[in-house]
Amino acid sequence: MRKYRIIISGGGTGGHIFPAISIANTFKKRFPDAEILFVGAEDRMEMDKVPAAGYKIVGLPVSGFDRAHLMNNVKVMVRLAKSLRLARKTIREFKPDIAVGVGGYASGPTLWMAASQGVPALIQEQNSYAGVTNKLLAKKASKICVAYEGMEKFFPADKIVITGNPVRQDLEEALSKKEEALAFFGLSPEKKTILVVGGSLGARTINRSIQGDLDKFFASDVQVIWQTGRYYYSDASKHLKAYRGMPVWCSDFITRMDYAYSAADLVISRAGASSISELCLLGKPVVLVPSPNVAEDHQTKNALALVHKDAAVMIADKDAEKDLVPTALKIVHDDERLCTLSRNIETLAQRHSADRIVDEIVKIIDKK
């Protein structure tokens, strides 16, 4: 059997990293002798998460463009030039059969240099609205794996394959663990539970909304699992000292998302593509608060794709501190509404996405 060599590039947030690791794990399960190398951004969370998953990673000194302060981009361009050189060196030394881009800062220079050296490239576009980098890379890609219909307005139709977004493999059996999950968080099976997640780094508006309205949760006999993200945990934990003994579990990062989803009757979340894919797979009712701080406002577009099918409720970031908690509490006590949202979001699930993407990778390599 042929020994495949693959580069997977991208990261920056859990929404890019966990699908990338899922693709790698699926490939290794099918082809145990495969050599897989990750290429990420040197100061981002992939530099920790990827080695923890058992894979080697090279860090590029790449960073995003500052659209608000154009003069700051001189340093960005210098870092980009260094990243292109390191990406070229990495590709020459590793000699991959294919380069797979999953989004994030490192994906652009890696796939660009791979294509310039005759290495086939595959893009995994997670969002319903393609970013500038992937639109540029599309010309050089052999295939583009997407999660939403209608992506031919961004990419050549003959290159598009609808695969869905891979999810963390520990979520596969999440719904069968509710009693075990509630015990893990020290919560009661007699109360409704709301899971609050703002992404691996955190979401300021969501955290402020929860912090400001904690009394409303407890007055409504609702318990909370709250992931603050790395940047907001210190402030939240200080605030919670006034609520000792109340049914709230709080941490900067949830290591057992299978338990968190299983315990939750309702989820409050940003509208990143990876989170939405997980929610669809598990049929979890959700109130989405799209981040306004993303390229092309793509999270709002992701959320609206669900809202238009009555598969989620959306609160604009600017309205969250006023409306988020009252809306969530109204929904969590309405079993009929919970059932409708759950049923509708589950119909949008794309299952076995990592396997489909691996199929496309193998087809491209075997054509060489």
Swiss-Prot record:
InterPro entries: GlcNAc_MurG, Glyco_trans_28_C, GlycoTrans_28_N. Pathway: Cell wall biogenesis; peptidoglycan biosynthesis. It comes from the Bacteria. UDP-N-acetyl-alpha-D-glucosamine binds at T13, G14, G15, N127, R168, S200, I254, Q299. GO terms for cellular component: plasma membrane. Keywords: Cell cycle, Cell division, Cell inner membrane, Cell membrane, Cell shape, Cell wall biogenesis/degradation, Glycosyltransferase, Membrane, Peptidoglycan synthesis, Transferase. SUPFAM superfamilies: UDP-Glycosyltransferase/glycogen phosphorylase. GO terms for molecular function: UDP-N-acetyl-D-glucosamine:N-acetylmuramoyl-L-alanyl-D-glutamyl-meso-2,6-diaminopimelyl-D-alanyl-D-alanine-diphosphoundecaprenol 4-beta-N-acetylglucosaminlytransferase activity; undecaprenyldiphospho-muramoylpentapeptide beta-N-acetylglucosaminyltransferase activity. GO terms for biological process: carbohydrate metabolic process; cell division; cell wall organization; lipid glycosylation; peptidoglycan biosynthetic process; regulation of cell shape. It catalyses: di-trans,octa-cis-undecaprenyl diphospho-N-acetyl-alpha-D-muramoyl-L-alanyl-D-glutamyl-meso-2,6-diaminopimeloyl-D-alanyl-D-alanine + UDP-N-acetyl-alpha-D-glucosamine = di-trans,octa-cis-undecaprenyl diphospho-[N-acetyl-alpha-D-glucosaminyl-(1->4)]-N-acetyl-alpha-D-muramoyl-L-alanyl-D-glutamyl-meso-2,6-diaminopimeloyl-D-alanyl-D-alanine + UDP + H(+). Transmembrane segments: none annotated. The keyword Protein biosynthesis does not apply. Belongs to the glycosyltransferase 28 family. MurG subfamily. Cell wall formation. Catalyzes the transfer of a GlcNAc subunit on undecaprenyl-pyrophosphoryl-MurNAc-pentapeptide (lipid intermediate I) to form undecaprenyl-pyrophosphoryl-MurNAc-(pentapeptide)GlcNAc (lipid intermediate II). This is UDP-N-acetylglucosamine--N-acetylmuramyl-(pentapeptide) pyrophosphoryl-undecaprenol N-acetylglucosamine transferase. The lineage of its organism: Bacteria, Pseudomonadati, Bacteroidota, Bacteroidia, Bacteroidales. The gene is murG.
